[in-house]
């Protein structure tokens, strides 16, 4: 197993948010554009930990967080005397969703919508999977945005959508299954508007990425741009340029010239209208 995968695995399975700096971790951070150096340590946000997981899966075909005991305490109780041996959190297996516009969920045979400011947490086996595929689906990377889903300025084609948090622990499995069955024309991803975020969007290989509709107007002068974050993503920028084409390649080149890195939170807080770019 490559040293990078082993290092990411130890971080994720150990539930850690920081590591000591070293050659391996410096390489990982240069490649992915995540992590904040604090003295002799590198600190990661929950979203960055999820990016590390996706990086490992995309680059090496391995899930560094896989654990055969996954499934929660109820599942563990069926074959072990101590249900507390499960590494899962109490609510970690629940999917976190919201419904925008006229979209709705079918949960345990009932139609469900979410009022503004609220979200729904549900077991994946309670969802009507066939109905789910008929709805538009927007995957949000930053879970902190979920209570503010109504403020996301979705493009017209995704105005009526189920909004689903991408997850960061056990619920990632349920999200992955839903995404695998979702029609590409009914799927969109909302990541940071920076090299790392859009490279991660390309890794998905399906659906569309949501970007600012007027991205050409964003630049070094933009007050909520984070050029320092952009400069830490040189390897991710190269990966994006090497793989992107069309509008996404033009975006990558614009990011490079303007040192652009705009977080999802700022796009939502400032009511920036989004546009959908197909990934394939």
Write out the residue ranges for each language-model feature.
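Nucleic-acid enzyme cleavage-core boundary/entry regions
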Residues: 1-184, 196, 202-280
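Terminal interaction module
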Residues: 187-192
């Amino acid at each position: 197993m490559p040293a990078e995968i082993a290092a990411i695995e130890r971080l994720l399975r150990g539930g850690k948010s920081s590591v000591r700096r070293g050659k391996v971790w410096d390489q990982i951070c240069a490649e992915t554009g995540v992590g904040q150096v604090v003295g002799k340590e590198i600190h990661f946000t929950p979203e960055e930990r999820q990016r590390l997981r996706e990086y490992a899966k995309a680059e090496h075909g391995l899930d560094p967080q896989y654990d055969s005991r996954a499934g929660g305490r109820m599942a563990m109780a069926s074959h072990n005397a101590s249900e507390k041996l499960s590494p899962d959190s109490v609510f970690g297996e629940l999917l976190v969703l919201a419904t925008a516009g006229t979209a709705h969920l079918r949960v345990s045979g009932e139609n469900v919508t979410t009022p503004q400011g609220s979200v729904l947490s549900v077991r994946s086996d309670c969802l009507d999977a066939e109905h789910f595929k008929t709805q538009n689906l927007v995957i949000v990377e930053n879970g902190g945005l979920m209570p503010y889903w109504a403020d996301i300025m979705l493009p017209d084609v995704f105005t009526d959508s189920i909004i689903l948090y991408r997850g960061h622990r056990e619920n990632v499995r349920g999200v992955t299954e839903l995404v695998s069955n979702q029609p590409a024309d009914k799927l969109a991803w909302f990541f940071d508007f920076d090299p790392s975020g859009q490279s991660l969007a390309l890794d998905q290989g399906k659906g569309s990425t949501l970007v600012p509709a007027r991205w050409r107007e964003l630049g070094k002068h933009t007050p909520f741009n984070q050029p320092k974050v952009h400069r830490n993503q040189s390897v991710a920028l190269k990966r994006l340029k090497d793989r992107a084409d069309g509008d996404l390649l033009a975006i990558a080149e614009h990011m490079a010239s303007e040192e652009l890195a705009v977080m999802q939170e700022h796009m939502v807080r400032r009511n920036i209208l989004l546009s959908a770019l197909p990934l394939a």
